[in-house]
Amino acid sequence: GGAIFWPKRFGPGQPVPNDLDWDLYLGPAPALPYDGDTGPHRFDIGELNWGQHHYDFIQWATGSDETGPVELFTADGCTNYKYTNGVTVFGRAYPGEPVGGDGGAVFVGTDGRIAVDRDALVSYPASAAREPLRPGEFHAYRSDSHSGNFLDCVRTQKRPICDAAIAHRAASALLLGGVEKQLGRPLRWDPVREEFPGDDEA
C-alpha cells in the first residue's frame, strides 16, 4: 500500500550534515534551507510519487503503453490527457454511482464501470468484472512483486510487466500534467519526439 501526502512546510534552517549534498538533493526545486527532514514527501502531492503506480495501468488499458498524450487541458481544476486513439483520461473522480477503489482508476464503458487500485477491483454492475476473456483477447500475466518479476525476467528473457520504457511513459505523462498546471493553459505534446511543438515556454 501507500499514501499521498500534501507537502510539508519546511522548518527553521539547520546546518547541513557533511555527508549530504543539499544542492544535489534539491535538484531543480527552489533553493530552501535544510531543516533536518529529507523525507520523501517534501515537494510533491503524490502525482509523481504514487500517481505513476496507477497511471502505468491506465496507459496499458488504453493501449498507450509506448506513447503519450497529445493534448493536455484542465477541466474542473484537474489535468486531463487526450490520446491519438481518441481516449481521454480524466484526472478526477468519475461522477455517478460509486464503484469502490481507493485512489486508483475508473474505466468507463458502455456496459458498466470498473474501478481498480493497488488492492482491489470493483465493478458496477458486479457482473462487468466477471465476464471471462475470450480466445484471442489480451491476457496480462499476474505479478505480485515488481522486483520478483524483474529477476524472473532476467532469467527467462520475458518482458517485465512494467519495464523501463513503460515506466518512463507513465512518469512523463504526469510530468506533462505538472507543466500544464504550472502554465495554466492547454498544451499540445508530440509523444514521438517528446516535445511541445512550437511552444518554447512549455
Where are these regions (language model features)?
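Contiguous beta-strand/loop segments that form the cofactor/metal-binding neighborhood of enzyme cores
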Residues: 1-202
